[in-house]
């Protein structure tokens, strides 16, 4: 993949490909990257976009349970869990790299402008990706200021990677995102505008781009063990949910019976249903929506129902199972598996900004995402936690400390770097 590198010629850490029982120092190298470095002279992160992260059977000694985990937290270009914590990692990071590569192919610059909330890992991920490709990042923040923003770990990490910050008065996207677009229009027209949530708005982008974006993540389904019958996925932005459901159409699993989407943010069922239809048409995956819908907190949900008068009275049983098909869609086939959805956010079991720590063996589940899901599963569906179930880790909580050895060129700025831009 890359030419051999003399590890003495630079300070980053050369690593072997992931080998489960290969131990050096304090623990196994838990990353799929051969070299840990920001420097493109040493490694190209995009070379690893389609490399599979492993699936591992991990025991929980506290509960005597064993479950398979999809380790997307091993998509980690700057760390390897040497001390139990990871740097930037996960599915979202992979997608950000892909988006930047596509932008560069189209003639854009590696500079990046985006806006997000102070607690989002999007900020350090975006800044690191831009820096890896030789660019600079401007992060728009709302409801904070230069004197207080560094109290937030994700903002601090973004500053460590070299981001500058532009501040707006409101923390709402309706204020933050227009400022991002003004920055691009008036300061840096060739910069990449990274959308909130590291995604592509399917109402603005071509079906080809939407399909490519999700088929990238869908490729990670390929190495799910064939014996798996149940798949558990955190449902936040639902980009990963959509990618995994795309992957299940690309790489069908012979024994899969149930997919559990556990919603820890605002309900995104329409988002998933809309995107799957776009992807199915573009990628010739007509069976992509052929699954039984068990939307437990939305039992009357039918895709497209809100646009049809009296839909609930006119939809056939097949329509209820498969969702309303748009004109020109292929004939209904038997469902391949059941998709269950629980909405923990809207039903107030937990709110998106709440945090729930959860430790499964040596795995620290992300308290905003996977930690909530595992807590709910243990309380409501503990029978799922067995060797026929795979729990999809979208990513783990990132920390600066594990990346310091790979990034000796980085340091925390003495003052918050501020872009003073205000639009005309």
Curated annotation (Swiss-Prot):
The keyword Aminoacyl-tRNA synthetase does not apply. GO terms for biological process: symbiont-mediated evasion of host restriction-modification system; symbiont-mediated suppression of host innate immune response. It comes from the Viruses. Transmembrane segments: none annotated. It catalyses: 5-O-(L-seryl)-dTMP in DNA + H(+) = 5-aminoethoxy-methyl-dUMP in DNA + CO2. Keywords: Decarboxylase, Host-virus interaction, Inhibition of host innate immune response by virus, Lyase, Restriction-modification system evasion by virus, Viral immunoevasion. One of its GO terms (molecular function) is carboxy-lyase activity. Disulfide bonds: none annotated. The keyword Lyase applies. Belongs to the pyridoxal-phosphate-dependent aminodecarboxylase family. Converts 5-O-serinylthymidine (O-SerT) into 5-aminoethoxy-2'-deoxymethyluridine (5-NeOmdU) as a step in the pathway leading to thymidine hypermodifications in the viral genome. As a final result of the pathway of hypermodification, 5-NeOmdU substitutes for about 40% of the thymidines in the viral DNA. These modifications probably prevent degradation of viral genome by the host restriction-modification antiviral defense system. This is O-seryl-dTMP PLP-dependent decarboxylase. The lineage of its organism: Viruses, Duplodnaviria, Heunggongvirae, Uroviricota, Caudoviricetes.
């Amino acid at each position: 993949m890359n030419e051999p590198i003399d590890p003495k010629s630079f300070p980053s850490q050369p690593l072997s490909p992931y080998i489960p029982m290969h131990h050096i120092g304090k623990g196994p190298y838990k990353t799929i990257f051969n070299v840990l470095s920001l420097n493109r002279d040493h490694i190209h992160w995009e070379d690893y976009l389609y490399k599979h992260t492993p699936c591992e059977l991990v025991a929980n000694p506290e509960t005597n349970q064993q479950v398979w985990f999809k380790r997307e937290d091993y998509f980690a270009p700057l760390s390897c869990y040497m001390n139990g914590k990871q740097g930037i990692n996960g599915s979202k990071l992979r997608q950000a790299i892909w988006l930047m590569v596509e932008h560069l192919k189209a003639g854009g610059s590696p500079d990046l402008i985006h806006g997000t909330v102070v607690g989002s890992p999007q900020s350090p991920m975006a800044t690191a990706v831009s820096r890896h490709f030789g660019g600079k990042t401007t992060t728009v923040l709302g409801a904070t200021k230069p004197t207080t923003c560094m109290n937030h770990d994700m903002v601090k990490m973004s500053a460590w990677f070299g981001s500058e910050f532009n501040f707006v008065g409101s923390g709402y996207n309706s204020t933050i995102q227009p400022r991002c677009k003004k920055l691009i229009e008036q300061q840096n027209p060739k910069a990449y505008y990274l959308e909130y949530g590291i995604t592509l708005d399917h109402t603005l982008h071509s079906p080809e781009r939407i399909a490519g974006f999700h088929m990238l993540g869908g490729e990670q389904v390929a190495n799910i063990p064939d014996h798996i019958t149940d798949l558990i996925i955190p449902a936040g932005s639902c980009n990963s949910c959509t990618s995994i459901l795309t992957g299940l159409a690309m790489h069908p699993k012979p024994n899969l019976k149930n997919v559990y989407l556990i919603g820890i943010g605002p309900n995104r069922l329409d988002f998933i249903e809309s995107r799957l239809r776009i992807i199915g048409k573009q990628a010739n995956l007509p069976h992509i929506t052929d699954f039984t819908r068990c939307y437990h907190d939305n039992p009357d949900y039918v895709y497209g129902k809100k646009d049809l008068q009296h839909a609930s009275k006119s939809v056939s049983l097949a329509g209820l199972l498969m969702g309303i098909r748009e004109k020109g869609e292929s004939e209904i086939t038997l469902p391949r598996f059941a998709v269950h959805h629980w909405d923990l956010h809207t039903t107030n079991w937990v709110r998106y900004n709440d945090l729930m720590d959860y430790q499964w063996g040596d795995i620290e589940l992300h308290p905003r995402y996977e930690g909530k899901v595992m807590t709910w599963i243990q309380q409501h569906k503990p029978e799922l936690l067995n060797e026929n179930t795979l729990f999809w880790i979208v990513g783990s909580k990132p920390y600066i400390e594990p990346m310091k050895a790979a990034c000796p060129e980085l340091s925390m700025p003495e003052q918050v770097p501020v872009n003073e831009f205000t639009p005309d």
